[in-house]
């Protein structure tokens, strides 16, 4: 079971399009990227999530061209679900990945 943030982020990145379809449902696929307004799932096109790794960078990373914000899919889960505590973010990521939840 993944215990640390980087392992969860890697597992989410392998499922980047499914993560985007679930948590960023107001967006859409555009080639190798998922575009949406922002990490809170606002409609628009200023945020891009890289769906697969490429010479430009690893899959699962995103940048919002309007604000300069960037991050990984754990940040998407945090923002789109309105979560504050990392433990809750990790539990939601594990739920999405169908992994056992962490101990409190």
Feature map (PLM): residue ranges:
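N-terminal structured subdomain of primase-like DNA metabolism proteins
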Residues: 1-104
């Amino acid at each position: 079971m993944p215990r640390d943030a980087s392992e969860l982020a890697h597992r989410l990145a392998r499922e980047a399009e499914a993560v985007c379809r679930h948590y960023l449902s107001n967006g859409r696929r555009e080639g190798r990227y998922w575009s949406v307004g922002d990490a809170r799932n606002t409609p628009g096109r200023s945020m891009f999530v890289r769906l697969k790794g490429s010479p430009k960078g690893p899959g699962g990373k995103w940048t919002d061209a309007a604000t300069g914000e960037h991050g990984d899919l754990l940040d998407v889960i945090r923002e789109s679900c309105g979560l504050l505590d990392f433990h809750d973010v990790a539990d939601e990521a594990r739920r999405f990945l169908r992994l056992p939840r962490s101990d409190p």
